[in-house]
């Protein structure tokens, strides 16, 4: 009995300690000692119920038994509660969109509509007038049933005064013009009974001024007067009311309305629960997670399982997404919830998720670990980054090991200078956040650029939570973009830590930004600037890599940035480069990155085109050096991680790869090529979506054999089968259709990959023969890239003749659709123009249709017809074995055994 008593007492003391920790964390955000997630959930439930009761009482009194009908139209904005303790929806459409909201912020009373409802009360929204009247009476008197005095003074600012006063009269009220600006004039505010604001309002520190008026007891009615467009002024006014503007487009697409059939009970229910999800809170408190999901409905594709078709799962996921969106709105605005009034419930959500993270253990399985899986699924969506203190997630699974937890951070401010290479994108800062440790960041003058900071670069598919026992890392490693204002410090704490990225838009390409960071950790980071001596940067990188104190590294070279697990890079260096880091870095720059951008003909700083390319451009009067026409594309990011967004490698920006980073690798150049391929160089659009990108690894493999004697991927191009398909197809009554059916008709993503590649290599062999120089063969694709960018961007009338489009009045289309001939046409014209031969016979040989306009243009050149040809080979990289077959008189025998 005594032992039992002592145990109970110890547990009680522990619970009390957690209560105290929770009370303190609600003020500071410091959840590092908070481990009792159930305790936090109970407190959250109590707070949610208090909010529901307050909302229910207010809304029930406002609605009475009046019509709920309301239609703001498509040209309107959503107005959302931001601080849930003190704000609430007033009108929620049938699609769940908030069309008007109420505010009790700062002890005042506010109401905001997503359209100028005051101009609609005598027309489309006449039925809404009685409800608006009660709402205004509540604003002015604090009681929706208490009539406003006759000639109560209304100050109208930023919206048409006459229309506003007439609108209030249409609602059955008797307003009088205050004839002064209660927003900026304190004496006017003291005598006015209502302030009506529109998007035309202005004041110094607008949000703070609105809040001050509210706090002083002046009721505020805001009407959005900017249609479905967002408005900076509106956003500031709403922020002062504790509300927020909806996303771009507002109600334009949803056209949400409150139907006349809506009941008072239903509206009260919707408003009371909005943004709180009491049912989800109840699940968390009770641990009553659903256990009967039909996981057999999940599907798998290239190694990744998805469960979108599991009945009921999407509803659960959407509810969690709503919660995530509400909290991320604060992250994105760099607002610390623990410093904002009216956010107790949101703070409790964050602290609950923090406490859950203290106890997460990987891996988990959706079927075998039902409760843990679903609880973690919710907690993963709830992260508060902007705060002075927080907690680290103790186990990070396949994302990072224990050494990330113990990385030392800087105790003093570091100054970093970053160059923004394009108008928008993101770039590595060169530092990282350590889990649970406070980091402060600020930027100095950014010019006209808008800046934000982000952590990590993984796409959501890099967490394979639906795969069997593969929920083995946090679900949202990449943070939202957190806004940065010039010379204003933002404090961040991440439970996971991660690589810091500067996100930018509206920048002047080439401009520099100074970033100041305190409390950051240093990962191995290599920054190679074109044309600069990088020897010290390389030495520092090698030293950091050899120290082996980080799980992640970054490398920036030209237009490529690599964000990689150290083991994925270290493994390749040791296995493929004998531990020679210098050689690895040199080939990363020259063989992988430079090779691709040079082949595509971009204007690379401090690097001239080859004499052969320069001569071809000069002869044709082409502008091949313009940094406007041929500017390097925006930064290509590469994630090298345990998992990819799709399969083992997944294109995009970033592109993902799961294998070790190898400068000579096929997959690296294949994925990079996806972001360099263009519609004008595709045969049948998407039918060569996995083909036209492969000129980049093909060129690299040819170069690696020639320069290093290593023969890689030597069976990639299937000349033999391509030839066989052509021979069979041309035996039909319609040869072109016969070959098309065999070679191009199959829409499969990877269909006939090696055979279709043979078309692209034909022209390398042809150009090498034409120039009598095997080293110039690949120049044809550089010239075609230079050609297509001029077709795309140069002054059409001035340059079309020089580009071989003299008969085209308008710039031709650029469709990537498989049914289009846009790419076929451009290839026919470009190749005929460059080779000074009519290449229609060879295009027909390959089953490639072209338009009448393209054929007429080629005929207008007056070039000699090039008889149909086929370059045969039994190797991919060795071009000395290539044999030319004349296809104009039949189908010669295959020239290899």
Model-flagged regions — what are they?
Residues 498-499, 505-558:
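Exposed low-complexity, polar/acidic, P/S/T/G-rich flexible segments that act as propeptides
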Residues 541-769:
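Catalytic cores of extracellular degradative/oxidative enzymes
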Residues 103-117, 129-138, 146-155, 187-232:
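Short alpha-beta junction capping motif
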Residues 314, 347-350, 358, 362-404, ...:
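Beta/coil-rich, acidic/histidine-enriched accessory regions frequently appended to metallopeptidases
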Residues 250-392, 551-571, 579:
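Activation corresponds to long, low-complexity, non-globular regions
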């Amino acid at each position: 009995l005594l032992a039992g008593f002592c145990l109970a007492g110890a547990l009680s003391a522990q619970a009390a300690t957690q209560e105290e920790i929770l009370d303190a964390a609600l003020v500071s955000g410091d959840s590092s000692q908070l481990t009792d997630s159930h305790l936090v959930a109970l407190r959250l439930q109590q707070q949610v119920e208090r909010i529901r009761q307050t909302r229910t009482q207010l809304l029930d009194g406002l609605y009475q038994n009046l019509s709920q009908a309301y239609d703001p139209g498509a040209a309107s904005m959503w107005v959302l509660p931001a601080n849930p303790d003190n704000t609430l929806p007033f009108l929620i459409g049938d699609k769940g969109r908030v069309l008007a909201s109420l505010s009790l912020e700062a002890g005042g009373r506010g109401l905001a509509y997503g359209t100028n409802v005051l101009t609609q009360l005598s027309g489309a929204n006449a039925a809404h007038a009685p409800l608006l009247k009660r709402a205004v009476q509540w604003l002015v008197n604090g009681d929706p049933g208490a009539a406003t005095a006759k000639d109560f003074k209304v100050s109208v600012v930023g919206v048409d005064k006459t229309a506003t006063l007439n609108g209030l009269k249409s609602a059955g009220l008797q307003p009088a013009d205050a004839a002064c600006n209660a927003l900026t004039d304190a004496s006017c505010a003291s005598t006015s009974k209502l302030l009506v604001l529109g998007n035309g309002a202005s004041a110094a520190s607008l949000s703070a001024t609105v809040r001050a008026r509210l706090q002083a007891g002046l009721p505020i009615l805001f009407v959005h007067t900017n249609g479905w467009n967002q408005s900076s002024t509106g956003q500031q006014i709403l922020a002062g009311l504790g509300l927020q503007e909806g996303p771009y487009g507002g109600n334009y697409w949803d056209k949400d309305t409150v139907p006349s059939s809506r009941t008072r009970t239903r509206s009260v229910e919707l408003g009371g629960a909005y943004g709180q999800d009491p049912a989800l809170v109840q699940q968390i408190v009770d641990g009553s997670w659903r256990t009967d999901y039909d996981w057999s409905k999940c599907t798998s594709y290239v190694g990744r399982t998805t469960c979108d078709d599991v009945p009921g799962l999407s509803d659960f996921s959407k509810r969690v997404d709503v919660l995530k969106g509400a909290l991320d709105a604060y992250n994105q605005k760099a607002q610390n919830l623990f410093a904002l009034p009216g956010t107790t419930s949101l703070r409790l959500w964050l602290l609950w998720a923090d406490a859950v993270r203290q106890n997460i253990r990987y891996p988990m399985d959706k079927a075998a670990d039902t409760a843990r899986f679903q609880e973690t699924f919710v907690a993963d969506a709830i992260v508060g980054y902007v705060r002075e203190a927080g907690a680290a997630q103790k186990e990070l699974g396949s994302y990072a090991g224990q050494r990330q937890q113990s990385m030392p951070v800087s105790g003093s401010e570091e100054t970093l200078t970053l160059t923004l290479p394009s108008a928008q994108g993101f770039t590595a800062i060169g530092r990282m956040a350590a889990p649970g440790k406070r980091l402060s960041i600020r930027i100095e003058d950014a010019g006209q650029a808008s800046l934000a900071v982000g952590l990590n670069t993984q796409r959501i598919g890099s967490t394979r939570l639906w795969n069997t026992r593969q929920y083995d890392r946090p679900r949202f490693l990449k943070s939202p973009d957190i806004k940065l204002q010039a010379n204003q410090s933002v404090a961040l704490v991440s439970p996971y830590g991660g690589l810091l990225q500067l996100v930018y838009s509206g920048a002047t390409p080439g401009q520099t930004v100074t970033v100041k960071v305190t409390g950051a950790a240093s990962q191995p980071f290599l920054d190679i600037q074109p044309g600069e001596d990088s020897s010290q940067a390389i030495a520092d990188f090698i030293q950091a890599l050899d120290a082996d104190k980080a799980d992640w590294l970054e490398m920036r070279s030209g237009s490529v940035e690599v964000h990689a697990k150290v083991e994925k890079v270290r493994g390749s260096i040791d296995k493929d480069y004998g531990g020679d880091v210098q050689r690895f870095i040199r080939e990363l720059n020259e063989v992988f990155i430079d090779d691709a951008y040079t082949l595509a003909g971009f204007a690379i700083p401090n690097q001239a085109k080859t004499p052969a390319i320069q001569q071809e451009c000069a002869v044709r009067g082409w502008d091949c050096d313009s940094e406007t026409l041929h500017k390097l594309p925006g930064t290509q990011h590469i994630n090298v991680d345990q998992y990819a967004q799709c399969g083992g490698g997944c294109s995009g920006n970033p592109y993902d790869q799961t294998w070790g980073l190898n400068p000579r690798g096929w997959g690296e150049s294949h994925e990079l090529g996806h972001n360099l391929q263009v519609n004008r160089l595709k045969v049948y659009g998407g039918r060569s979506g996995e083909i036209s990108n492969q000129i980049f690894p093909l060129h690299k493999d040819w170069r690696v054999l020639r320069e290093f004697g290593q023969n890689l991927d030597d069976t990639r191009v299937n000349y033999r089968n391509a030839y066989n398909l052509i021979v069979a197809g041309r035996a039909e009554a319609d040869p072109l259709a016969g070959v098309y059916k065999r070679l191009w008709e199959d829409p499969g993503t990877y269909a006939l990959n090696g055979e279709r590649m043979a078309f692209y290599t034909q022209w390398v062999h042809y150009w090498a023969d034409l120039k009598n120089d095997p080293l110039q063969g690949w120049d044809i694709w550089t010239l075609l890239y230079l050609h297509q960018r001029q077709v795309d961007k140069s002054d059409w009338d001035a340059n079309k003749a020089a580009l071989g489009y003299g008969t085209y009045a308008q710039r031709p289309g650029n469709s990537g659709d498989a049914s289009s001939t846009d790419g076929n046409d451009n290839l026919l014209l470009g190749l005929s123009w460059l080779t000074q031969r009519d290449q229609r016979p060879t295009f027909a040989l390959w089953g490639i249709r072209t338009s009448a306009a393209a054929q007429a243009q080629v005929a207008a050149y007056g070039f000699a017809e090039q008889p149909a040809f086929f370059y045969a080979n039994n190797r991919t990289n060795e071009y000395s074995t290539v044999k030319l077959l004349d296809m104009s008189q039949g189908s010669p025998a295959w020239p290899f055994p």
